[in-house]
Amino acid sequence: RSSDLLAFASINLNADQTIGGTALNLLATALAMVIAKGVNHSASAKLDYSNRVFVYDFGPLTVNVFLFIGLVALILSYIVLYKTRLGLRLRACGEHPQAADSVGINVYKMRYIGVLISGVLGGIGGMAYIIPSVSSWNFEVGVSGAGFLALAVMIFGQWKPFRIFLAAVFFALFKSLANIASSIPFLADLGWTQNMYNMIPFIASMIILAFTSKKSRAPKAEGIPYDKGSR
């Protein structure tokens, strides 16, 4: 439950979210390797598992269950954020926490809820990245920076669910292109290595963010610790 630690550090201790998130990212990777090696009773951080329960065949297509989970999460996130009292309070605590506090909303509670929900969704995202595609995973390898690419998707999507979805699809196309580049004749003829193709999503994200980041408006109080006494 690394999201619990991040929530406590950033909300109760007023720690910088970027520094706290980076520290927890390093901690989670190291902890996963320790657990994997403990399970294996060896120096290997690789775990083997069956992923068939998450993958289903629909005619010529192979679809994993996380596709449907993602679509449900997208719809629910929109409904919760824009159609419910909880969503209104969450957004208020991200935009104007002092104003929210003045009408009786518990800003600390709302921010805890937001961070914990984000932690759950992030965990599901990690499972979606690992489980359906392979039947074993080496925790020493990690996810090759996909988490940081997700941050770029959020910024490009301007913190709005459906825009984030479109941004995710856009970057997924580049990711898929990198995976199948060797089977496309004119790309294979370029003689690029697989590592060069794997760089494409990250290069694309930097180029796009360079042109769009100024127009992307984050919640006004994003990353700013809330001090009740500063009203």
Regions found by a protein language model. Give the residues of each.
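Juxtamembrane/transmembrane-helix interface segments of polytopic membrane transporters
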Residues: T29-A45, G122, G126-V134, A168-L187, ...
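Helix-loop-helix "hairpin" substructures at the membrane interface of multi-pass membrane proteins
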Residues: P60-N138, P161-F162, L166
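Transmembrane alpha-helical segments in multi-pass inner-membrane proteins
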Residues: P132, W137-F202
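Cytosolic-side transmembrane-helix boundaries in multi-pass membrane proteins
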Residues: S77, E95-S102, N106-K109, S182-R231
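Hydrophobic core segments of alpha-helical transmembrane domains in multi-pass membrane transport
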Residues: T29-M33, L67-I79, S118-G126, A150-F156, ...
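Alpha-helical transmembrane segments and their helix-start/interface "positive-inside/aromatic belt" motifs
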Residues: N12-L24, Y108
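Transmembrane helix-bundle core of multi-pass membrane transporters
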Residues: Q17, A28-K83, F186-M196, G223-R231
